[in-house]
């Protein structure tokens, strides 16, 4: 027993020594088995599992390549390549696994016709000497495409008045998918969907969705589509609902213009029903139909000319296998036909947008406001005094008329005749010349006795053209000319002053050509 213990201890030490030798041997860490980390494939398809040995050293000898599957913590051989023994594939892969390029550096295999049981962890192992075994593993996922379909309910859908309970109308199924698919609905209906997942023993999942709603007339002929999304695929299938409902009745034919003696009028009963209405019954609110009125199925004919006895409320009852509903119309008889007024030109041309009408009206209003403002401004400018309203600056005339405006006198004679006994002081001087004695004396005293005869004195000519005097100027002139006699001849050019003067509120006149500061 002691020998066996020593042998066991020696074996353990020898194994440890080999391991340390392999660990410190140069180039050991560069020897790597390369595989794909994960692979996936669909049931019934083929998948290639890559495996290669990288950077082999010349001193390292490869003896065997082995593929294994990890099952419940244990390893199960799948395929083996040995240079001396050849290729060996074990059951249940014998007919479905093959090496593509068997060699000491390439152990790639093909797994054909995938089954759900093929899913799992696969190990690729290279046996080397003296460094030992080198391996890597990959994960294979097997996917199953689901089978999808939609089916409507086998029960008859009937819309009933006052019904609030939702009933099953369609079922969408996505069966045996792996992983499970995503199911949804596409419709305008106001219903609700419920979902259920069933996990099958082989690992696949079946998804079932049921759609429920309250049957109604509005739901009839509406489309309901089932949408299944799986991996990169999208499935869509739809159906059209068939909902039975009782008739919805309307009466047509009365246009509001039934008048005396009108001919060839009728009423038609229209029933929206599923299945279609099979029976129609006409009555009036009073009971029986008037004389001259005949019912033929869904049409009510009025024979002969219209008279007042045909006025009243007419009722049509329509019946189908689901139920009976009625509709009514009130008929009025007038003495004369109603003739609508012809449409306006603008209406015939089409409605004018409100924005255009508002824009045109606003533009016209703006133009009127601007024109009115200009007119008011011009009138104020014409009738308003622009000068200084100080009490010191009153406006006087030029001494020959009130407020500075020359009066429109008839032309004066060139030579005025005075009696011989007239006072010399009252006689005017020669027309066209100066008539003031003091001015003559000033001219004689200061000007050497020379004076121009036959024309106005320059000073008086200048004063005559002035439209006004200030208060100071007026007082000064009153001192100098108060005792003198006017002998000035009117100049025709001064008559134009009246055309250029504007009347003021205080009775005075202001020239339009002057600005007063």
Swiss-Prot record:
The Ig-like V-type domain is involved in homophilic interaction in cis, a prerequisite for cell adhesion. Ig-like C2-type 2 mediates neurite outgrowth through binding, induction of phosphorylation, and activation of FGFR. Residues 149-238, 247-334 form the Ig-like C2-type domain. Residues 436-445 have a biased composition (Acidic residues). Residues 31-355 are extracellular. Changing residue 61 to A: Does not affect interaction with herpes simplex virus 1/HHV-1 and herpes simplex virus 2/HHV-2 glycoprotein D. Cis- and trans-homodimer. Can form trans-heterodimers with NECTIN3 and with NECTIN4. Interaction between NECTIN1 and NECTIN3 on the pre- and postsynaptic sites, respectively, initiates the formation of puncta adherentia junctions between axons and dendrites. Interacts (via cytoplasmic domain) with AFDN (via PDZ domain); this interaction recruits NECTIN1 to cadherin-based adherens junctions and provides a connection with the actin cytoskeleton. Interacts with integrin alphaV/beta3. Interacts (via Ig-like C2-type domain 2) with FGFR1, FGFR2 and FGFR3. (Microbial infection) Interacts with herpes simplex virus 1/HHV-1, herpes simplex virus 2/HHV-2, and pseudorabies virus/PRV envelope glycoprotein D. Residues 377-517 are cytoplasmic. It holds the Pfam family C2-set_2. It is a single-pass type I membrane protein. GO terms for molecular function: carbohydrate binding; cell adhesion mediator activity; cell adhesion molecule binding; coreceptor activity; identical protein binding; protein homodimerization activity; protein-containing complex binding; virion binding. Residues 1-30 form the signal peptide. Changing residue 129 to A/S: Abolished interaction with herpes simplex and pseudorabies glycoprotein D. Decreases susceptibility to infection by herpes simplex virus. It comes from Homo sapiens. Changing residue 125 to A: Does not affect interaction with herpes simplex virus 1/HHV-1 and herpes simplex virus 2/HHV-2 glycoprotein D. Impaired homophilic interaction in cis and cell adhsion activity. Changing residue 133 to A: Does not affect interaction with herpes simplex virus 1/HHV-1 and herpes simplex virus 2/HHV-2 glycoprotein D. Impaired homophilic interaction in cis and cell adhsion activity. It is linked to Ectodermal dysplasia, Margarita Island type: An autosomal recessive form of ectodermal dysplasia, a heterogeneous group of disorders due to abnormal development of two or more ectodermal structures. It is a syndrome characterized by the association of cleft lip/palate, ectodermal dysplasia (sparse short and dry scalp hair, sparse eyebrows and eyelashes), and partial syndactyly of the fingers and/or toes. Two thirds of the patients do not manifest oral cleft but present with abnormal teeth and nails. Disulfide bonds join 51-124, 172-226, 269-316. The modification Phosphoserine is found at residues 422, 434-435, 511. InterPro entries: CD80_C2-set (IPR013162), Ig-like_dom (IPR007110), Ig-like_dom_sf (IPR036179), Ig-like_fold (IPR013783), Ig_sub (IPR003599), Ig_sub2 (IPR003598), Ig_V-set (IPR013106), Nectin-1_Ig2 (IPR041850). Glycans are attached at residues 36, 72, 139, 202, 286, 297, 307, 332. This is Nectin-1. The keyword Protein biosynthesis does not apply. Its main location: membrane. Residues 399-488 are annotated as: Disordered.
């Amino acid at each position: 027993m002691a020998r066996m213990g020593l042998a066991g201890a020696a074996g353990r030490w020898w194994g440890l020594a080999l391991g340390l030798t392999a660990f410190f041997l140069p180039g050991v860490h560069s020897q790597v088995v390369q595989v794909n980390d994960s692979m996936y494939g669909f049931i019934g398809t083929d998948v290639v599992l890559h495996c290669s040995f990288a950077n082999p050293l010349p001193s390292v000898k490869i003896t065997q390549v082995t593929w294994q599957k990890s099952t419940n913590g244990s390893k199960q051989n799948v395929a083996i390549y040995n240079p001396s023994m050849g290729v060996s594939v074990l059951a249940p892969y014998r007919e479905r696994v093959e090496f593509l390029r068997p060699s000491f550096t390439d152990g790639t295999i093909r797994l054909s016709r995938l089954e759900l049981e093929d899913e799992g962890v696969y190990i690729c192992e290279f046996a080397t000497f003296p460094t030992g075994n080198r391996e890597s593993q990959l994960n294979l996922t097997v996917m199953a495409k689901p089978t999808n379909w939609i089916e409507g309910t086998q029960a008859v859908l009937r819309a009933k008045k006052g019904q609030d309970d939702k009933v099953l109308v369609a079922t969408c199924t996505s069966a045996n998918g792996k992983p499970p698919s995503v199911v949804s609905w596409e419709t305008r209906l106001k219903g609700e969907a419920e979902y259920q997942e069933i996990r099958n023993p082989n690992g696949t999942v079946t998804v079932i969705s049921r759609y429920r709603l309250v049957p109604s007339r509005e739901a009839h002929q509406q489309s309901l589509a089932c949408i299944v999304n799986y991996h990169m695929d999208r499935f869509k299938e739809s159906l059209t609902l068939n909902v039975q409902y009782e008739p919805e009745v309307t009466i047509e034919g009365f246009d509001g213009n039934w008048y005396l003696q009108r001919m060839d009028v009728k009423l038609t009963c229209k029933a929206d029903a599923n299945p279609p209405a099979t029976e129609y019954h006409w009555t009036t609110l009073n009971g029986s139909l008037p004389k001259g009125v005949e019912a033929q199925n869904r049409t009510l004919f009025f024979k002969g000319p219209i008279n007042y006895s045909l006025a009243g409320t007419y009722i049509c009852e329509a019946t189908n296998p689901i139920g009976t509903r009625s509709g009514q119309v009130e008929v009025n008889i007038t003495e004369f036909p109603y003739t609508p007024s012809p449409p306006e030109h603008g209406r015939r041309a089409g409605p004018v947008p409100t924005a255009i009408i508002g824009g045109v009206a606003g533009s016209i209003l703006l133009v009127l406001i601007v024109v009115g403002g200009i007119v008011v401004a011009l009138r104020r400018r014409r009738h308003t005094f622009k000068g200084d309203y100080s009490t010191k600056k009153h406006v006087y005339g030029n001494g020959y008329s009130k407020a500075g405006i020359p009066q429109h006198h008839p032309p004066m004679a060139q030579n005025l005749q005075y009696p011989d006994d007239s006072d010399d002081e009252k006689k005017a001087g020669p027309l066209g010349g100066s008539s003031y004695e003091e001015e003559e004396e000033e001219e004689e005293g200061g000007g050497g006795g020379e004076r121009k005869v036959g024309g106005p004195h320059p000073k008086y000519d200048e004063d005559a053209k002035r439209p006004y005097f200030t208060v100071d100027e007026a007082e000064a002139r009153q001192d100098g000319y108060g005792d003198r006699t006017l002998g000035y001849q009117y100049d025709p050019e001064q008559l134009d002053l009246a055309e250029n003067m504007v009347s003021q509120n205080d009775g005075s006149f202001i020239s339009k050509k002057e600005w007063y500061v």
